[in-house]
Each structure stands twice: as C-alpha cells, then as structure tokens.
Amino acid sequence: MVIEELAGHGRALPSGVVAFLFSDIEGSTRLLATLGEAYKPLLADHRRLLRAVWAERDGAEVGTEGDSFFVAFARPSDAIRAARDAQMALAGHDWGATSVRVRIGLHAGEASLEDDDYTGMAVHLAARVSAAAHGGQVLLTEACRALGAEALGATLGTMDLGPHRLKDIPDEVALHQLTGAGLRDDFPPLRTMERYRTNPARATDQLRRTRERGE
C-alpha cells in the first residue's frame, strides 16, 4: 500500500499496543466512472466527514490514498467508537442519488514505529480485515474486541463471525462484526479466502443473543 501523507495529520503517532483502522469506499472505481468530475466533491465530503471523526476520537491519520484511510489509535476503545461514528456520519450525510458505503477493519497489536510509519504484521492484518468487509460494515479482530471492550455495552456490541482465512495471513483470524443502533447488520458472506458459512437463521439468532447480552 502506498501512503501519501504521514505524521498523524497533526497528531503524534501512538506506540506500543496500537489499534489500527483501515477504511475505503466500496466500489469507488465504479463511482468514479459513473460520476466523472462529480466524484471529486463526493470524495472531499467523505474525507471531511471521516477526518472530523478521527479527530474527535483522538485518531492519528497515518496516511490516505484516494478513498482510503489508515488511522492509528492509542486506545482500542476509541478505534471502535470511531468506526461506529464514521458509519453514522456517512449514513447521515445527503449524498443525493449516489450510495456511498465504506468498509472498515480494525485490529489492535504491537507494531514498530520508525520515521513516522508503522511496520509489522498488526498493520497488515488490519488492512486484510478491512478488505474482507462490505460497504457499511465494520469488522474487528478478537484482539481489538477484547482490548476495546470498554466501548461495548448496551448500545454497541459485536457479533461473532468465527475464524476466517485472510490473504497472506498464515493463521485463521477470529472476526467480529460491530453491531448497534444505526448500524446495518445484513451483509453477504465476508470477502475472505474461506467464506463465512452459516445459515440466515443461525446468524440472526447469534445477533439476537449478542444484543441481549449487551442489554
């Protein structure tokens, strides 16, 4: 991944155990081809909305390229809340006749910081988690869910999607979907190497149990 902008967008980059967030617009190439020059103000609105969320939740923007963001958070709970807030901000914006859906992936772990850039498997894993999501969906690893548990409760929860194979990641990764008021919960199987296998009734029942635990 090529990063065009670094240095936290005015914020110091956190170190140690860091929560990483990757996001991008689903079908951005199709939108560009359809909208032409009208895509530029759409992209500008997208960036403005999300940058406001990152700043509100103490996120450090590591980089952006086109319609994607790479953001680091010192507290995984802030990353989880930021992902929720981002989807709410996007859903509440008037996009006219265009549908703009953003996929978000989260992972928390140790990463090396050198010359205002991160290296390590934690970064790559977060990017792969984002790539597995659908527009409007927030996926997070078990590590991020556990470390950011204080963000979860009556209004924000997770649904266990089980283990998945992600491209270039040697081991299966346990993934969760962020759930809560205002967040979509009806998505196709994840875009993973081995797609999530369940039946709709089981998935609905699992979501109901997750919400009941949150209440």
Model-derived features: positions:
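Generic secondary-structure transition motif, activating predominantly at the C-termini of alpha-helices
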Residues: V2, R47, L152, L156, ...
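Acidic/proline-rich low-complexity IDRs
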Residues: E5, P41-L42, T155, D160, ...
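Low-complexity, flexible helical/coil segments
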Residues: W54-A60, V138-R145, V173-G180, M193-R202, ...
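Catalytic beta-strand-to-alpha-helix segment of the class III nucleotidyl cyclase homology domain
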Residues: R51, F70-G180
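Intrinsically disordered or compositionally simple regulatory linkers and C-terminal tails
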Residues: M1-S15, T179-E215
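Catalytic NTP-binding/metal-coordinating core of nucleotidyl cyclase/transferase enzymes
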Residues: V2-A82, M88-A89
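Low-complexity, intrinsically disordered/propeptide-like segments
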Residues: L35, H93, T155, L190-M193, ...
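Short, acidic Gly/Pro/Ser/Thr-rich loop/turn segments
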Residues: S28, L113, L183-D185
